[in-house]
Amino acid sequence: MIELKHINKIYNGFNALNDISLTIKDGEICGIIGQSGAGKSTLVRCINMLEPPTSGDVIVNGRNMVTLSKRELREERKKIGMIFQHFNLLSSRTVYENVAFPLELSNVPQGEQKERINDILELVGLADYRNKYPAQLSGGQKQRVGIARAIVSNPSVLLSDEATSALDPETVKSILQLLKDINKKLGITIVMITHQMEVVQKICTRMAVMSDGKIVEEGTVKQLFEHPKHTVTRRFVQNVEANQTIEELAESLKKKYPSGKLLRLSFTGNNAEQPTIINAARLVPFEISIVESNISQSSVGPMGVTYIHISGGIDSDYNKFVTYLTDNNVIVEVL
């Protein structure tokens, strides 16, 4: 478990982190999302004490990292792997030798090194690339080497600082799937730092949203997708196809449909793929038009948002329509 308690980080009088408290459970994949400058990378570096907090407690696996001696901190850091946007591979070393590097620093016997490295290369899909050099690899393959190097020491925690932001969309999908597999097979707790909501949706079960050095909202991905409260969160939960925030899309729809009612319907899990709107429409006499819709896959199954326009009808019919939707686990928001 990772517990951050009242973390503050001050640089030359500037509060980069402001009274942050967050708990990440064992085996969880937790996303920390925010725009550039929000403080998320500073926060993740506090976890392994690459950036010691100005004040507050960082408790990892029951040990307060802030109070450890230098020797104790070195030992605890071995239990925390980290991957970055830039791969930081040694160009003169092969894939095998790059992965071996942290084991060499820890004086792990050669026989044990070989067994561990071979197992990890198999896990990350690079068994046939062990003798290749970084210059011979694609970006996705280089990141797989970085992941292998980060987990070869059997850490309990893996920190990912924008590890997919420099990759193309298809490679991002494969890297996220690899991280999910690692989490499932090895039970490693993963902390994902990202500015991409799609990354959080695909892999995380919980998320925290950062802005100006603070956590402004946190909860399950499902909760924050269905009920984004803070303005920053609502900006992230955007309609991908229209490339607009919720507020921008709502305003454009209101101008297009000045009369009648506009509803935002949020679906998750099985009901995202059910004909719920069609079934509800059969109960009422008024016209219903789907004016915008998007369904995407997430770590908790499909998630969808549909905007509908209702023309005419009386209140009792409208209430019947909304009641049917809510009874079938659809979140209804009137625009």
What are these regions (language model features)?
Residues 63-64, 100, 104, 111-128:
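Conserved ABC ATPase "signature" region
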Residues 218-219, 227:
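ABC ATPase "signature
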Residues 65-81, 105, 110-111, 227-228:
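ABC ATPase NBD coupling module
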Residues 169-171:
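Helix N-cap at the start of a conserved alpha-helix in ABC-type nucleotide-binding domains
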